[in-house]
């Protein structure tokens, strides 16, 4: 039974034949193969199947590691399969099991501890066993194949380097702090010379560019600032420079201020470049998550988790509170309410929600982010797939979330790029510079209005009314209360008439403008939660505001009832006093009659 030896190298498959059939059963195998002369006598070169390229080498070796018989290896084994009862020594046990399953191949593979010393000696003297193989070339091929195999095992892809995102977002946060510190220092430093400039130019980058371009404020008339500022702002800067209250500075002081202003400009330009890089990298690595929460929030989530794969392993509930670990454990320790959101709070969809809806929106968004980041980490797309195809799940999920938010809020939501305030109302982005006119005093407000009514009663009558008995005051109060009730009833009747005058077409039009169904709009309109203003616009009250109005109305009604009860009790007291006086007067009259008699 002949003994063959199969060796996998970085250059190809090597097939050798042992001179002694019982070589593996030898007790002193290591001593028989401890030199070049001895190993060349014991092992003879039979054939070498060379790999055509590095890609082929990676494919073949990866198949061997996974225990697969590749077509190239199968053709090599077919040459020795013609011999009867062949024994084949193999280094990989998985490969030996796979060779044993090949049909029509009478080969008995051996892959146990007896082959360890044999393959150790072959690897040590491999260049001497294969003719034409140089040790230098063999080392280079082994190094290249080991790198390629490591990439293959780790599923490495140059487009999915999430470490770059972690470093980029950390650097972006540090840049913001440094830039803010330097910009404030420049304003304080240059403010001694030209303090009015900080009020005219709130933008840090424009402020620094003005310092570098203009220098001393005395150069404002000759300096060309049109490339930096609009015409109106340029005129305001030059006018303020002429009447500035700042102190004079030396050229050396100004030179150091300019150096710091240049650093602010360089940092601002680099920050913009880094922000664009982070946006592009996030769209390449996590397009679905970027579509849902934005590039900056998504990058912070990845940095907090450590990698895209680590973030993909987390459920939606963990992603929802990621970044609020201190508050979570403090709440669990003190047995208080746990936080509803962490880093995801800064997403635009959560920011547009108001009040209690923020928690609901954060929970829904976190569940969609969990699905999106798993797709980003594990899904495989063709190389020619466009960005929209890669982010299709995120686009669909965002559309659903926007619809849910519209139903929760009962109003149309802001567009994707609009910044939102803490109360859920979109905030208009402030311009870099703006000149506001001072409000003038309204002189007409001092005079009496032309339609003002003259007092109905002279002052003497008012004094008499104050001296009148309390019963008349109570009667006047009752009359005023009745008039108020009549006014309220009239208003309610008018509102009911206005509601009845609306047609189905009007309800459909108004419901579409409010972003809700017709039935829902009718219910809220009849309830009073939605009202139509004089200019035709809708006033939609949230549940909290509507409940607050009802509570205020109930309090007013209770306050009105209290004086009514007091007036009734006072009337009863007055009647009781009158009865007592009449009883006292009757016996007095009887006494007078008896005295006359």
From Swiss-Prot:
Domain of life from the UniProt record: Eukaryota
GO molecular function, one term: snoRNA binding
Compositional bias (Acidic residues): 552-561
An individual GO BP term: endonucleolytic cleavage in 5'-ETS of tricistronic rRNA transcript (SSU-rRNA, 5.8S rRNA, LSU-rRNA)
Principal location listed in the UniProt entry: nucleus
SMART domains in the record: NOSIC (SM00931)
Gene3D superfamilies: 1.10.287.4070, Nop domain
Entry function: Required for pre-18S rRNA processing. May bind microtubules.
Protein name listed in UniProt: Nucleolar protein 58
């Amino acid at each position: 039974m002949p003994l063959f030896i199969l060796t996998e190298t970085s250059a190809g498959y090597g097939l050798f034949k042992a001179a002694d059939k019982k070589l593996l059963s030898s007790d002193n195998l290591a001593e028989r193969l401890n030199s070049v002369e001895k190993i060349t006598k014991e092992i003879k070169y039979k054939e070498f199947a060379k790999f055509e390229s590095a890609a082929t080498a990676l494919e073949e070796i990866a198949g061997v590691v996974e225990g697969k018989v590749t077509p190239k290896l199968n053709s090599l084994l077919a040459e020795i399969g013609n011999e009867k009862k062949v024994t084949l020594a193999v280094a990989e046990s998985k490969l030996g099991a796979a060779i044993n399953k090949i049909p029509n191949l009478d080969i008995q593979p051996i892959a146990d501890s007896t082959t360890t010393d044999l393959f150790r000696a072959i690897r040590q003297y491999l260049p001497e066993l294969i003719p034409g193989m140089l040790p230098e070339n063999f080392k280079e091929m082994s190094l290249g194949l080991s790198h390629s195999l490591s990439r293959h095992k780790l599923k490495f892809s140059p487009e999915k380097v999430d470490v770059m995102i972690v470093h980029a977002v950390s650097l972006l946060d540090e840049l913001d702090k440094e830039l803010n510190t330097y910009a404030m220092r420049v304003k304080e430093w240059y403010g001694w010379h030209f303090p009015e400039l900080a009020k005219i130019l709130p933008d840090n980058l424009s402020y620094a560019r003005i310092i570098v371009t203009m220098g001393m404020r005395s150069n404002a008339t000759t300096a060309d600032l049109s490339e930096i500022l609009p015409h109106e702002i340029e005129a305001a800067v030059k006018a303020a420079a002429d009447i500035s209250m700042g102190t004079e500075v030396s050229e050396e002081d100004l030179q150091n201020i300019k150096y710091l202003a240049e650093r602010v400009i360089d940092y601002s330009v680099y920050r913009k470049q880094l922000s664009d890089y982070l946006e592009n990298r996030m769209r390449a690595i996590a397009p679905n998550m970027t579509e849902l929460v934005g590039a900056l929030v998504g990058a912070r989530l990845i940095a907090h988790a450590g990698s895209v794969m680590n973030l993909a392993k987390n459920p939606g509930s963990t992603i929802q509170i990621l970044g609020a670990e201190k508050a979570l454990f403090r709440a669990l320790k003190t047995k208080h309410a746990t936080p509803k959101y962490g880093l995801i709070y800064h997403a635009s969809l959560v920011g547009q929600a108001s009040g209690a809806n923020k928690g609901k929106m954060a929970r829904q968004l976190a569940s969609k982010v969990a699905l999106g980041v798993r797709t980003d980490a594990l899904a495989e797309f063709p190389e020619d797939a466009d960005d929209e195809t890669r982010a299709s799940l995120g686009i669909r999920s965002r559309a659903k979330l926007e619809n849910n938010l519209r139903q929760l809020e009962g109003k149309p939501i802001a567009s994707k790029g609009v910044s939102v305030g803490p109360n859920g109302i979109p905030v208009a982005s402030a311009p870099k510079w703006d000149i506001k006119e001072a409000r003038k005093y309204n002189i007409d407000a001092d005079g009496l209005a032309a339609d003002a009514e003259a007092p109905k009663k002279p002052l003497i009558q008012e004094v008499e009314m104050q001296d009148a008995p309390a019963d008349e005051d109570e009667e006047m109060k009752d009359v005023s209360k009745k008039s108020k009730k009549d006014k309220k009833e009239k208003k309610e009747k008018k509102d009911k008439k206005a509601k009845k005058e609306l047609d189905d077409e009007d309800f459909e039009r108004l419901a579409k403008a409010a972003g809700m169904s017709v039935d829902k709009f009718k219910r809220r309109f009849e309830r009073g939660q939605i009202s139509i203003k004089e200019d035709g616009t809708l006033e939609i009250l949230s549940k909290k505001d509507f409940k607050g109005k009802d509570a205020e109305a109930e309090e007013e009604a209770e306050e009105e009832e209290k004086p009514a009860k007091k007036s009734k009790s006072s009337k009863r007291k007055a009647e009781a006093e009158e009865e007592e006086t009449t009883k006292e007067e009757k016996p007095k009259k009887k006494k007078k009659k008896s005295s006359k008699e």
